[in-house]
Each structure stands twice: as structure tokens, then as C-alpha cells.
Amino acid sequence: DLFPLNLERIEDQYMAMIHRMPSCEESGLKDDFNGPICYTPDGNPLVGPAPGLRNMWLAEGFSFGITAAGGVGNYMAQMMVNGEAEIDMASLDPKRYGSWMTTEYAARKNEECYDHVYILHHPDEERPACAGLRTSPAYDRQKAAGAQFGRVNGWDRPNYFGPLDADENFDHDSRSFRRGKWWKYAVDEAKAIREGVGLIDATAFTKHVVKGPGATQFLDWFTCNKLPKVGRINLTYALTGSGTTRTEYTIVRNGENEYYLVSAGAWTAYDSDYLRKAAEDKAAEFGYIEIHDVTNQWGVFAIAGPKTRSVLSK
């Protein structure tokens, strides 16, 4: 439903329009619309298969109305008929949001997104609304150590560690179309791991346990690399029907029919939905398969660098 017209809200803009186009003053208002605008927390619409359902598709959340209708209709048809679009649609996928998203989060991020529509955007800028929604157990220690956080899939993750006395606007003020103040800190961290050793909080990565009598056959079909032996680890990919990359997985084989899968932290609901639907489709062929999302249950640290073994030996 539309709201009552409130010209006072647009008086400044209306007068500016008349100044720019004087004929508008004589023509007057012929019609009016005052209604809500659809927004999503990141400003992108929701386009693609609905999570957890089959043959259910979403195309909503368009903040600029019908302007994307032609393109969305084309790529939606490709997904429905061919199983995927000819371009990467991940940034619009409805599953980029998970069960962690609260009503308050949606409201505050939508307001923030609306406020930034016509503001200059810098590369990799981070926006503060709803900071701290999802954090690892090490969050307070990281913050005390100067961590400058970015937000992915609701998680606060350290982008880099800045000066201990940095104020809350340090990262925002360091963003630029050139090298910002963050540059030297990121370089130092990369050099430390490349030449020495470093500790990485990987808690926000997506984590699944796949097990059951059909797990080995299923993952052998689902991924394109040879599965590791028990107690070993390898890198592999799940592919689309046309052979392009769908998801990158690190697989740890904990038992004959039990596997621990790690994938990108940004796509937990996306990967979980794909895994579950694929397992359901193949259960009759391969046998019983369990899929457990343990992302929120397990905290993870990774230690990396050429001096890793000497640290672990102490």
C-alpha cells in the first residue's frame, strides 16, 4: 500500500528541480507515489533458488525497481532450464544470508545501505552497522591487539592488525583509491608468515562433517580430486554441471566413511544447501549420508609459515 503524500520531505529536491528545469514549476505535479522501497542488507537483490526448497525461486529485493527485470528474467530462465546461469550469480544468491540474520540486523543494515547509495564508495570499505554480531572466542584478545575487523557472513574477522592506539575510525579513514594506511600492516603480516610463522583465526570458515555408509562414494562423485586416505588432507573442488568451479573444499578424512570439509566463510548456507540437496539426490544410489554444519560449534586456529614445525615441536 502507498503512503499519504508528504511534499515537505522532498521540498528541497523539488525546488532544486524547478531551478534546474523552470518549466516544471508551471506543469506542476500530475501524479504522485509515496511507498516503501525494497532493500537488502548489501543492496543486491535476492535472485536464485530458495534455500532448503526445490523448484522454488526468488527474484526480489530490487531497490531500483524494474531496471534489472530484463537481465534477471534472462538469467533466472537459464538457471531454471540449464541449472546455472552463464554468468556468476553468487553475489545475488538468496543463500548469502543464513539463519544468523536477525530482524534487527536486516533493519539496521538496510538503513545503512540506503544511506550509502549516493556516497562515494572506496575499495574494500567496511561498514560498521551490526558489528560484533558473530565473533570467535578470540575476538576480545584480537581487538586488544589492534585488530581491524571486516564483516563476512555476519562474522567479524580481522582484516589486519593496526596500531594499538588506533581509534574506531582508523580503518575507515585509511580507505582510498590508492594505498591506504592499512598497507604496511598487511605487508608486515604477509612477510611474517612467508618468512617465519603466524597464527590465523579460521573460526569463521564454513565447516561440515559428512559421514555415513554412502559418504565416500558420495564425495568421490561430488568432488573432482581423489579423496585423501584416512588421517590425510587434500584440496578439491565441487563443480557445476558445466564443469565450472562451484566450491573449493579442504577435506580431512577422519575415518573410512567420515570426512571434515572446510570451505569459504562467506558461503555457509550456500554450501550447506548444495551439499544436502546433492546428498538427498544420491542417497538411493550411494546409501545413507549425514551432513552436519558444525561452523558455529568448532573454533579453529591455523598455524602457517616455514617455522611452523619448530613452534609445534616446543
PLM regions with names:
Residues 2-134:
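C-terminal catalytic lobe of FAD-dependent flavoproteins
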Residues 87-88, 93-314:
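Glycine/proline-enriched, intrinsically flexible loops and inter-domain linkers
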